[in-house]
Structures are given as C-alpha cells and as structure tokens.
C-alpha cells in the first residue's frame, strides 16, 4: 500500500527500484527532501486581533526562531533547491530569504507555483524590429536597389528586370514604376520606424530601459524580472513575487471600472509584503522599537483586510481625496509608521488608475483575448471582483499562518505538465500575444496590418490548440516552427533544457536558446564598444603565428566568435551581480581563468573556465571606457554652471594666438572640472582605445573600394591586421605607469597622455579652485623650460583641460 501512495504506477516503481531497495527507504528519502515552514502559531486574523503586544511579540519571535533553525540545519540545501527553481543565484537568495520569515514564505509559495525569475537583460524586449513582415519588405527594397546599382554600373547594357520576382512559369516581372513605389513606401516607413524606435525600449547609458514606462509592470505576467540595476537594499523581488501570487481579474467584457478596482486590489498584499512583512525584525533589546513594529504590523494587516473588502463608495472617496493630492505610492519609499503605510495604499489608487488607462486596450485586444482563454479560471485568474476578494483573503492567511511545504522534486501537475513547464509554455504564448499587440496596435509599422495580423493570429491559435492537446516537447517544436527565436529568448536560464532542440549537439548553441545574446551584445557595445571590438578582432585573428591571447595556440577554448564569449558571460554568476554591465563583464573576464562558476543557476563544468583572458589590458580598457561613459552621462545631464570654465575660457588656436612668457602676467589659469588626471600602468592604452574606437569594418570596406586587384587587396588587408595586432601585443606587454588627462569638451571625449611630472603640477593647479596668475603658476614648476611648459599649457587649453582668462 505504501508503494501505491509514493509511486503512482508500476513503471515509476521499476524506475526507482534500482536506487532504493524498499518502500521504507523511498519514504525516508522523499520525506527528507520536503521543507516544512510553519506560519504564525495563530489560528486566523480574528485571533491575531485579540492578542496584546506581548503575545504577538512572542508569536513573531517563535516564528523567527523556527525559521532560523530551519536555515541553520538545511539553509544551504534549501538555497540550492530554490536557486534552481527560481532561477536566482544563492547569494541573491541568501540576502533576501533571511530578511524576514515572511520573505522566505513568499519565495516558497512562488516556487510551489512554478514562478521563476527571468533576467531583465537576457529577455528579448519587444520593439519595432519585431515586425517581421517589415524586415521582409526591407529585404525586398535592398534587392531592388542593389539591382538598380548593378544596372547603372553595367552601363545599361542589360534591360532592367526583377528576376528574383519571376517564377519558372514566366509570370510578369515587377514593373519599374512599382519598384520605385515600393522604395518610396519603404522610405516613408523608415521614417515612422525610426520615430517608434526612439520611443521604444533601448540601451541608455549601459542600462536597458523599458519604454514606455507603463510596460515595466504587467499584473498578468507569469514570471518575475530580475533587474541588476536595482540596489540590493531596496530591491522589490518579493513585491513582484507576491504580485504574481495575487493573480488578477479578467473577462472578455472587462470594463474600465472593473479593471481599475481589481488593479487596486492586486497591489494590496504585495505592498504589505514589501513595506511591512519583509521588515519584521524585532529587536529584543529595545521594547520601544518592538512596540512600534508590532503596532505597525497589526494595524497594517487590519487596514489591508478592510481594503480588500472596501466598498465602491469608499473608493470614490479615496479618488476624490487623491484628486487634491496627486501622489503615487512610489513617492513614499520607507515606511516609518502605520500612517505612512496607509498613505502608500491610498496613493496607490493613482497607480491603479494609470495602470487601467495604460493596459485596458491591451488586455481586451484580440491576441490577449486568445491568450487569456488558455488560462484556468479561478486558478490563473478570476472573472469577478467578488471571487477575487475571497482569493486574496485566503492568500493573506496563507502568508501569515499556514504551514508551507516545498518539495523540489514534486510532480504536482496541471494537465500532465509540471507547474514551471505549464507557465513556460503560457509565457511563450503571452510573449507572442504581446508582440502582435505592440506591432499591430502600437507601432503601426505595417502598411497591410490587417492581413498580417490575421495570419499571425491564426498561428497563435494553432499554438494554443497545441498547448491543450499535445505534449510539452511537441508544443516546443511547434513554437520553434511558428515563433521567432526572439520570442523563445525569455531570459529564463532554467528553461534551456526544455527549449533546446533534441538534435542540437552544440553545447553553446543550447545554452543561448533562452537568452537574447544579440540584446546583451548591444548593451555591451553601448558601454564598452572598444573592448568589444578588441575582443572580436582578437578572436578572429589570433593564431599560433599571431598570438593575441595567453594560450599556446593563441585560441580561446570553445570560443570561436564574440557571441560564444558573451554566451559564456550570460550563463555565469556575474550576470546576476548588482553592478554596472561593464563591471560585471570585467569581473567575468578577470575570473574566467581560475574560477568555476559554482554559484550559477545552470550546470557548470570545466568548459566554463576560459583560459587566456588573464591579461590586465581588458580591465584597464573597460575602466577607461567606464570613465568615458560617466563623463558622457554627466555632460548629457550638464548644468551649464558646472562647465563654466570650458564655456568662458579663451581658446588658443593658431600659433599667432599663442601666449609668450612675457605676457603671462596678463592671464589667469584655472583647472577644468571636466577633466581628471588618471594614472594607468600601461603607456599604450590611449592608442589601443583610439584604434578600437574606430570602425575597423569600414576601414576594410574602404580598402575593398579602392583596390580592385585581389592579391594586392589581400596583402593590404593582411598588413592592416598585422598593424593592429602589433598594437594589441604592445599594449598587452606594457606595464609602464602613464598619466592621462581624461575628460570631455564640446561633446567630445579626450584621452590625452601627459608626462608623469605633471602629477604634482596638476595637483597644484587644482589646489587653486579659483585660479591663479599664469606667470606664478609657470614659475612654480622646474622640470622643463618655461617656454616648453607654456606650449604644453597652450595645447591643454585647446582641449579644454585648462581655462585661460585675460586679467582685468
């Protein structure tokens, strides 16, 4: 009988019998894997309200002690299991689940429901490039224009045709007039496309910014975003998790009012989790603090309970009061007392109104109606506020009181699929629905939207039927057939095993299936373009005869392209650090030589170690580009008064304008605030940065245009690459300390090498923030002649490093 309970059928028993000799050992193994986390030792909220502060304190401390005991005994094991389930690193989990017993409970509830984290930068964000029909039209125009150029270069010897549009049945080719019309249409489309792209999600200052902002949060999303730009201390991971646990309300005829009121309900428990439950940390040495915390805890739960059952009249009243004080919940970051929490909830009514205005059109669009019809009513969503309120009451009690069991080996299924698999498939459908909505209802980049939209809807409908009637593997294969690879790039590293093609033998190709390498590459190019160009050139050109990496044969093992290297980075633990993208990549490069990523969410082995990237030149170049990016950002946000020196200083140009020493008592000199003097242990860094900041592909294209002889062209390209390779080798071998002025003037970033003797000179000038007489400044230095020093100052003035002002 025990076997029947533990193992559902004989085939499963045979499978497990090889590992366990008896049902009792099976039971023991199964039980040891289950985590049981008790809630507050209180029956319900009614009993909670009847307790005094001392009793509540005792119950909270009991919960804290029991949770800490579990973490002490099985914490490492638990974090490992949760890491795989939630797609987070152990370090991230450790910080979050140890904040409060209620935080751990929220994470476990989410894990039980198959909720996982996708990486913000690795999940392909929808933008106008996802209009696939537009790309086909662009390709057509490119062919037409190429054919036109070929016709002109051939001297008109061949009659203008469109052979690629003719078939074997001798159908009429496209007329010249029609070809020109297509080109004009494409030019108009391009203008509209560029405008839409400027307002869409893109990389800004090394961060992937979701635009418009309303798209950053959707209550009906199935998974949670891990955003590395969010500081650890203020991150809202548990808030997002509880938002997913809170579900949502939807029906085909959902009114504005229904959506608004349900959106308000949706945010109640997540706000309680973020501002109250996550911060329950009693200080046993301070009764006053504990009293405040307990009162806040109790009053907030009472307030949330009342809000769940709030009447329409109360909502009208709150709306009217918000009209006179137009705030959102984001304006209050820290909760100091129960009153502040009530303000957050009351102000969130503004957020709910904004949410309804931004999303009602989306959730009632055809693609989303089709998608929502695949969800399970009263399980994935609710059709009425009345049912939804009952669900929220139950969720609140579960978070507070119920024992939560987490079994990482659980086979609890929905329609034969594990919870995560079920959500993964729904997520792919939802991503495609969102793409169709954005392309056809928002971007409007298609001139024949109706026809293409109907075609795409049929594909989505087919996949919906496949979801209901076919296995997971069949669904994935059909998804690969009907969906773009960009849609499969869901940012869920723990979905690779489900998404990879069974016929694929390339491990790197498999590891990039669920992540958008192109999007991450764009991000790296946006912040460290020279480093990316250096690595790409080195990977292509390094060999045993031209060693550009620190390996015997000049090659990086299993790295044949820049994409391969970035894929390794995307699958490492460094992608999850809360640092800038450039610094995460820098740490990955530095540690790849001697560290195996044992703390990743994916399996690791010896192939994760990249030998040959241990040269410090990469870190130096990345740090330099970081400085350039910082200067560019400061310049973009510039307050005019901050750069008054560059704006008001005289600028010496021709030699006739140069100042002679005898005239130096007529000028004041002052150091620019836009430049810093930096010491770097590499005298080749500036030249390396300059070389790889240029477009190397364009340089090759110029050679191809100028040189028609194939042998001469190959010789020139070889010489060109050898010259660049020498710069790389020289920079890799250089360790000479060198000083550089790094700064920005007239929107141009400059990296200027300067003699080492300038360090005390610059420090002297900086010690006079209001400037000093040019003659006095020159007289204070002795390492070169006054004329040579003045000449250097003149050059620095041209770049804006120092300001010169005629003395009144």
Swiss-Prot record:
One of its GO terms (biological process) is cell migration. Disruption phenotype: Mutants have no defect in cAMP signaling or motility, but are unable to respond to a spatial gradient with directed movement. Residues 152-171 are annotated as: Disordered. It comes from the Eukaryota. It is found in: Mitochondrion. Keywords: Chemotaxis, Coiled coil, Mitochondrion. GO terms for cellular component: mitochondrion. Residues 43-78, 694-733 form a coiled coil. Required for efficient chemotaxis. This is Protein tortoise. It comes from Dictyostelium discoideum.
């Amino acid at each position: 009988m025990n076997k029947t309970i533990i193992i559902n059928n004989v085939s499963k028993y045979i499978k497990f019998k090889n590992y366990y000799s008896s049902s009792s050992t099976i039971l023991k193994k199964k039980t040891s894997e289950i985590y049981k986390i008790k809630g507050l030792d209180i029956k319900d909220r009614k009993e909670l309200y009847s307790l005094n502060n001392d009793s509540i304190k005792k119950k909270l401390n009991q919960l804290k002690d029991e949770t800490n005991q579990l973490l002490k005994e099985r914490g490492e094991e638990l974090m490992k299991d949760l890491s795989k389930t939630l797609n987070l690193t152990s370090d991230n989990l450790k910080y979050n689940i140890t904040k409060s017993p209620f935080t751990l409970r929220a994470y476990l509830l989410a894990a039980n429901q198959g909720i996982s984290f996708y990486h913000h930068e690795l999940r392909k964000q929808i933008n106008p490039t996802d209009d696939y029909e537009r790309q086909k039209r662009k390709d057509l125009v490119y062919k037409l224009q190429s054919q036109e150029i070929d016709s002109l270069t051939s001297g008109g010897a061949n009659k203008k045709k469109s052979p690629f549009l003719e078939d074997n049945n001798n159908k009429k080719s496209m007329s010249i007039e029609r070809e020109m019309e297509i080109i004009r249409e494409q030019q108009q489309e391009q203008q509209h496309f560029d405008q839409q792209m400027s307002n869409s999600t893109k990389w800004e200052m090394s961060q992937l910014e979701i635009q418009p902002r309303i798209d950053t949060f959707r209550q009906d999303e199935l998974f949670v975003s891990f955003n590395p730009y969010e500081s650890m201390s203020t991150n809202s991971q548990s808030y997002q998790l509880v938002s997913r646990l809170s579900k949502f309300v939807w029906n085909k005829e959902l009114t504005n009012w229904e959506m608004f009121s349900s959106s308000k309900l949706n945010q109640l428990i997540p706000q309680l989790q973020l501002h109250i439950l996550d911060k329950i940390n009693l200080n046993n040495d301070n009764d006053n603090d504990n009293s405040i915390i307990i009162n806040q805890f109790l009053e907030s739960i009472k307030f949330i309970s009342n809000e769940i059952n709030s009447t329409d009249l109360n909502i009208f009243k709150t709306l009217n009061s918000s009209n006179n004080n137009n705030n959102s919940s984001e304006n209050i970051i820290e909760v100091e007392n129960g009153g502040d929490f009530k303000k957050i909830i009351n102000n969130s009514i503004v957020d709910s109104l904004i949410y309804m205005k931004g999303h009602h059109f989306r959730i009632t669009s055809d693609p989303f109606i089709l998608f929502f019809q695949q969800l399970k009513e009263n399980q994935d969503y609710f059709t009425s506020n009345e049912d939804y309120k009952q669900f929220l009451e139950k969720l609140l009690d579960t978070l507070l009181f119920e024992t939560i069991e987490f079994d990482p080996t659980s086979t609890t299924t929905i329609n034969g699929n594990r919870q995560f698999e079920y959500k993964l498939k729904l997520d792919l459908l939802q991503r495609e629905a969102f793409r169709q909505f954005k392309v056809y209802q928002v971007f409007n980049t298609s001139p024949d939207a109706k026809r293409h939209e109907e075609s795409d809807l049929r594909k989505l409908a087919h996949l919906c039927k496949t979801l209901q009637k076919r296995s997971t593997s069949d669904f994935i294969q059909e998804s690969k057939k009907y969906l773009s690879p960009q849609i499969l790039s869901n940012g869920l590293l723990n979905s690779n095993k489900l998404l990879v093609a069974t016929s694929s033998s390339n491990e790197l190709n498999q590891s990039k299936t669920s992540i958008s390498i192109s999007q991450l590459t764009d991000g790296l190019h946006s912040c460290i373009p020279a480093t990316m160009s250096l690595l790409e050139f080195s990977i292509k050109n390094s060999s045993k005869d031209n060693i550009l990496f620190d390996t015997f044969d000049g090659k990086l093992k299993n790295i044949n392209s820049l994409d391969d290297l970035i894929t390794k980075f995307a699958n490492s633990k460094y992608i999850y650090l809360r640092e800038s993208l450039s610094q995460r990549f820098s740490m990955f490069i530095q540690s790849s030589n001697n560290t195996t990523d044992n703390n990743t969410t994916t399996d690791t082995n010896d192939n994760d170690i990249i030998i040959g990237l241990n040269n410090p030149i990469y870190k130096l170049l990345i740090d330099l580009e970081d400085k350039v990016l910082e200067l560019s950002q400061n310049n973009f946000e510039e307050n005019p008064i901050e750069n008054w020196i560059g704006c008001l200083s005289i600028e010496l140009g021709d030699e006739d304008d140069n100042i002679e020493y005898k005239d130096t008592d007529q000028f004041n000199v002052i150091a620019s605030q836009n430049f810093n003097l930096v010491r770097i242990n590499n005298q080749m860094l500036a030249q390396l940065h300059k070389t790889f900041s240029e477009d190397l592909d364009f340089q090759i294209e110029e050679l191809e245009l100028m040189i028609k002889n194939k042998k001469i062209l190959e010789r020139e390209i070889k010489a060109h690459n050898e010259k660049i390779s020498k710069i790389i080798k020289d920079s890799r071998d250089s360790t000479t300390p060198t000083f550089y002025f790094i700064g920005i003037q007239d929107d141009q970033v400059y990296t200027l090498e300067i003699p080492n003797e300038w360090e005390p000179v610059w420090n002297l000038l900086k010690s006079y923030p209001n400037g000093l007489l040019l003659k006095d400044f020159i007289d204070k230095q002795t390492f070169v002649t006054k004329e040579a020093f003045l000449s250097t100052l003149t050059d620095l003035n041209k770049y804006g490093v120092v300001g010169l002002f005629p003395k009144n």
